UniProtKB/Swiss-Prot annotation:
The keyword tRNA-binding does not apply. This is Anthranilate phosphoribosyltransferase. Mg(2+) 1 binds at S98, E232. Belongs to the anthranilate phosphoribosyltransferase family. Its EC number is 2.4.2.18. Pathway: Amino-acid biosynthesis; L-tryptophan biosynthesis; L-tryptophan from chorismate: step 2/5. GO terms for cellular component: cytosol. Anthranilate 1 binds at G86, N117.
Length: 349
């Protein structure tokens, strides 16, 4: 595909249901980054990509362009790191499960580099609830990176690292639908973690997201689509998984019944706003929360412990995570990170 191809020509390919090759996908993202695509065209591209569905090649190519313009202020930590960032956009209004999972997995020994943002198309994002709990996201990038070594977990606030995409946030919010940027968010962690557990809001995203992460060189990945449409493993029924390991994709499923726990409908995980999210997150992390909340976090944490190489047996990982929750260890991990980041209050290299 020629670099002389126009925006309109690229759009026509998508509108006709065609897939973009690696070069054209990269070019499209470069033009977004260089402000060569208008808001009207952006809306059309986002809608066309959503209607067609993105391929692994399109996603990985666009993600690599975003990572090229995201330079680290210091060397990447020489650690085996895991991310728990998912696509969001499932519309279920559950509490921030993946955020809780990050602290639980860290309390079990995983090194977590959690990439996240404020809400784009949902109600409350991971950054929203962490800010409301007092976590300082306005600190130097060096401090953010060093927290992985010092505490075992860090949070990378996406707009700080991907400033070029801030201008698209109002349009994404106005559209109110899942877009390619929901899919790209989990693929562009600046620390380039070695492994990831990635929740997707649509079953159709399982294969392309797994393929994208495989193409980007991830060691171990689980892409999960939860029963009832959650972008997490749920307690309601069968959860569909794609394992990425040793250069291959493997499809599987898990059900909380396999862990000798009962099925619970997704509406038991729903909250009404950020205040409730804060309360639920804290109660899960300190071990005082509802059984259903603790169980769903432990189930997803088991997936992270597999990705981290800590526990290959998901049943043992589930029990390990649940034990840590009931001991209140994840809340202690959160407080350590909160204290560590509070001593630095200047966004700078």
């Amino acid at each position: 595909m020629s670099f002389n191809i126009s925006n309109a020509e690229i759009l026509n390919i998508l509108l006709e249901g065609g897939n973009l090759d690696e070069l054209t996908s990269s070019l499209l993202m470069q033009r977004w980054l260089n402000d060569e695509i208008s808001d009207v065209q952006t809306g059309a591209f986002l809608s066309a990509l959503r209607a067609k569905g993105c391929t692994g090649v399109e996603l990985s190519s666009m993600a690599e362009e975003l990572l090229k313009v995201c330079e680290l202020p210091v060397a990447r930590p020489n650690l085996y790191m895991v991310d728990t960032c998912g696509t969001g956009g499932d519309g279920a209004n559950t509490f921030n499960i993946s955020t809780a999972v990050a602290f639980v997995a860290a309390s079990c020994g995983a090194k977590i580099a959690k990439h996240g943002n404020k809400s784009a198309s949902g109600k409350v994002g991971s950054a929203d609830v962490l800010l409301n709990l007092g976590l300082n996201l306005n600190c130097s990038l060096k401090k953010v990176i060093s927290a992985v070594n010092e505490i075992g977990i860090t949070f990378l606030f996406a707009p700080v690292w991907h400033k070029s995409l801030i201008k698209l946030a109002p349009l994404r919010k106005a559209l109110g639908i899942r877009t390619v940027f929901n899919q790209l968010g989990p693929l562009v962690n600046p620390l380039r973690p070695n492994a990831q557990v990635l929740g997707v809001a649509s079953e159709d995203l399982l294969e392309p997201m797994g393929s994208a992460l495989l193409k980007m060189g991830m060691n171990r990945v689980i892409v999960v689509h939860g029963s009832g449409g959650l972008d997490e493993a749920s307690l309601q029924g069968d959860n569909k998984l794609v394992f990425v390991e040793k250069g291959k994709l493997r499809f599987s499923k898990i059900n909380i019944l396999d862990f000798n726990h009962e099925n619970i409908p997704n509406d038991k995980l729903v909250v009404s706003g950020s205040d409730s999210n804060e309360e639920i997150l804290k109660s899960v992390l300190n071990g005082s929360g509802q059984k259903s909340h603790k169980d769903v976090v432990a189930l997803n944490a088991a997936l992270v412990l597999w990705a981290a190489g800590i526990e290959d047996d998901l049943h043992k990982g589930f029990n390990k995570a649940l034990f840590s929750i009931n001991q209140g260890n994840p809340w202690e991990k959160f407080l350590l990170l909160k204290t560590y980041l509070s001593s630095d209050d200047l966004i700078s290299p």
